Regions:
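N-terminal glycine-rich anion-binding loops that anchor highly charged ligand groups
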Residues: 2-4, 11-57, 66-74, 295, ...
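N-terminal small/glycine-rich loop or linker at the start of catalytic domains
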Residues: 2-15, 79-84, 110
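Glycine-rich anion-binding loops and their surrounding alpha/beta cores
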Residues: 2-5, 12, 18-19, 63, ...
Length: 326
């Protein structure tokens, strides 16, 4: 096989031929070393997304991200509650609020996130408004985790080489393969992940990627496309434990929760979403507080169950609905 090059890889993707793990790693190194042009990066992201990713292609991309990540001394005994973004609904920051609730339940949380590339407001924008500093050093981030049992990894600090592709992602303004990478490339690789995926074909792919890396957790997607475990529609859930993936179907009714409409979960800019979070945590009642509260509680429960599965694989008994209700 000839050595990788952009013309070879792009021609291959346009012909809907899969890359090898080696080829996708080569492309990611070119990007992270600053050797790819914006045209090459944009063409690569669009062509790969259009073809549809494979487990090996994602693995090659994530391999290189982790090789270049800034290391952190926290250990990995924790859960990351995270979504790929890209559902384009503009809801409040469910996974960020759920992470705080999970930590309040004494489950350690190592949350990895960035600014929104294709949506309205990402986790970091809201957390910044709430007074969370994004420029902390790795040592300071680790100290916060030691003290509070929860910390936030701002992706640009821990994946500095991703700065080369960030402007292109923003210019494109649509979900790409790179939406999948952040949740998989948490620099400490926590033992558990509760991962929401908006893309229908991407959700089982992400479960297979966790399986490939020997990680545990829950991957979920709402039938309406939300990257959350949702009360707005039924959900598909992939439970990953000990190298196995088990598929479940879950609805609000199964869990004793009221169904709602996406319009009841819509957020705004970072300030508006931060205001929702502070009101929710202070027990204030506000417009749509009940459906938002239910969503936050449900996704926090997903984080607790994911962590339980990682700590005690025998708990992955198939009774997912019972565990989420508990």
């Amino acid at each position: 096989m000839s050595e990788p090059s952009w013309p070879i890889i792009l021609k291959q993707l346009l012909a809907e031929e899969n890359m090898s793990r080696k080829q996708s790693s080569w492309a990611m190194r070119e990007i992270m070393n600053g050797e790819a042009t914006e045209a090459q990066m944009g063409a690569f992201m669009i062509a790969l997304r259009s073809k549809g990713e494979t487990v090996d292609e994602l693995a090659g991309l994530v391999d290189v991200m982790l090789e270049n990540a800034v290391l952190l001394e926290t250990g990995n005994d924790a859960v990351d509650i995270v979504g790929t973004g890209g559902d384009m609904f503009g809801t409040v920051n469910i996974s960020s609020m759920s992470s705080i609730v999970a930590a309040a339940c004494d489950v350690p949380v190592l949350k990895h996130g960035s600014r929104s590339a294709s949506g309205k407001t990402g986790a970091s924008e809201m957390l910044e408004v709430l007074g969370i500093r994004l420029d902390l050093s790795p040592q300071q981030v680790a100290k916060v985790f030691e003290t509070a049992g929860i910390t936030f990894f701002f992706a640009p600090v821990f994946h500095p080489a991703m700065r080369h592709v960030a402007p292109v992602r923003k210019q494109l303004g649509i979900p790409t393969t790179f939406n999948f990478l952040g949740p998989l490339a948490n620099p400490v690789q926590p033992i558990a992940t509760a991962l929401g995926v908006s893309d229908k074909s991407g959700a089982p792919l992400m479960a297979q990627e966790l399986q490939l890396r020997g990680r545990s957790g829950l991957v979920f997607r709402a039938d309406d496309g939300m990257d959350e475990l949702s009360t707005t529609s039924e959900n598909s859930v992939w439970e990953v434990s000990e190298g196995k993936v088990v598929n479940h179907r879950v609805s609000a009714k199964d869990l004793g929760l009221k169904s709602t409409e996406i319009t009841n979960l819509l957020g705004g800019d970072a300030k508006q979403n931060a205001h929702v979070a502070t009101d929710l945590f202070s027990g204030e009642r506000f417009e749509n507080s009940e459906p938002i509260r239910d969503m936050v509680a449900l996704n926090a429960a997903a984080g607790l169950v994911a962590y339980e599965i990682a700590k005690n694989p025998d708990s992955a008994s198939g009774k997912l609905i019972t565990r989420l209700k508990d």
